[in-house]
Each structure stands twice: as structure tokens, then as C-alpha cells.
Amino acid sequence: VQSPEDWERDELKKMPLTEDQYAEFLGIEHFYPPKGFSPLESLRFAPTLEFNGMGGGYQGEGSKTVIHSEAFVKITCRLVPNQTADEITRLVKEVIESRCPPQVRVEVKVTGGGDPYVVIPPGKPGADFDSPALLKKAFAAAENRIEEAFGTHPIYLREGGSIPIIGDLKRVAGLDSLLIGLFTNEDNLHAPNESFHLGIMNKAIDAFEKFFLDLVDR
């Protein structure tokens, strides 16, 4: 697993969120981050093995003396640079199958995946030495227009996501992607009662209009 650069850790410290606030938001008392990472760093920089859902047996109201014959669990993995979806899928499948007791049958179904993608802002440690001129222009324009619209400089963070096509765009077409996140914790992203702040949306529309005009050769 590739360790983050010092400048990335410094960027994370600019987030207006403390570990205590995040624990309260999650409703937990303790974190268990991997070695070498703080809780908030592990959220941004470390790979994951996530249990998204479990089921089996009677799940209705009250009790029932039923011994179920099947159970399932849905898992996902967030990957980081130097990992590939095929390799991690193989390793996870091998571990699950190797630890299955002989009295139990296990079946692992793979439904999809994508390789990780990260783009380092030109000029930062870890960035490509020969960053394309358009990429440099895009980062500069994004910084200027976001700061103009929101009154604060953007923070560069890694964010877990499921957009495999951006990795394919880089691999096949050699094109980088600039992803701009505008959600807040209160938005309940991909959860019940998901929302998006209209004030943020209006500022973003103005910023993006000017951003795309900045990229045009005029």
C-alpha cells in the first residue's frame, strides 16, 4: 500500500472535522485504524474490506425456532494505488475459501470491480514530471473558480468512490479526470433521505460555467 505524501496529510488537516466529531457522526466510541494511519487518514488513504449487508434465517418480528440453512454477506473493497481489482478479488476469494470449515459450502460471486485511480495536482510531490498543459490549466482554473464562488481555497483529498470508468479513461485514452466533491456529511450520500444543498449547487453552477470557459482557448 502506497503511503500518502506529507502534503496530502497536511491537506487532510485542513478539513473542518475532528476525530471526535466524526465518531459522534458515526455513533461509535472508538476507531481501529490500520497501523501507520490516523482514523481520518485511514478513511482517505487506506484500502478497505467492507461488509455492506448480511442476511440469513428468520428476520421478522418476534422469535422463531428456525435454524437457517443459508446465509449471505455482501462485501466490497476500496482499492488504493498499486492494487488492482483482479488481484484483490483473487486474494479475497482465496482467503474466504481457505477458511471455510469442511462442514460448510461457500460460494463467492464477483459482480464487478474497477482499478483505483488517483491524479496528483501538477507541481505537488508525487505528480508526473511531464503533466499535460491542459491538466495544469484545469487545476489552476478549478482552484480559482472554486475559491471565487465559495470564498475558500479547495482542499485536495482522496475520496473512495465507484467510478471505474475514470481509470479506464486514463488507461485507454491517457486522459486524467478532475473530480470535485461538493457534498457535506448532512447530505447522507447514497443513504436514506439523501439531499444536496441548493445554495452549494447554485455556487457550483456558476463556478463550473466559468471553469469550462477558462479551459477554452480564446
Stretches with model-predicted labels:
Residues 1-195, 199-209, 216-217:
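Metal-dependent amide/peptide-bond hydrolase catalytic core
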